[in-house]
């Protein structure tokens, strides 16, 4: 619903698809297991119910992330990046070396404004991995488009009080600033892929019925096979 920054009723109607990133992550992990991929795989699924109650976060509240970073809540409807940030932190804990973190999320409307509903936005800090994914997206007719981790936009995430803004304050480039926010929780520049997706077909088209859509699975599956298997 958006929490205290509540969505209009029309904006809530499709929110049953807001678990699309988790669905894709679970599906991809299931396929990798069934195909007996020779990788050490960890699946993490952060889940939140974002409704109004006496315990609701307020805009401009400051909370501490799992790694103790102070984060100012710019908009309570942007809860996904908060739980993703903590999950990225959790994924790097322990003594096992992490070679790659992939996250899937129905994160921003800005990605839909940039690319429409049928093409997820891809971000990565590793050009080779990004190219491998994009090449396989073309081969398997599973379209993604890379957007930049434009470093100059980092300044939009830093508040005057020294905290990290969860949403930034530029008003534009929201998919990029959301990705930059998540990137701040990587340690030692670990290889990372972020997929900002719709997870839903608004209309019927051949092979893609109206409803939930498992976009990016084929592209990532074949890319991982090429990179690691």
What are these regions (language model features)?
Residues 1-229:
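A generic structural signal for tightly packed, nonpolar segments enriched in small/aliphatic residues
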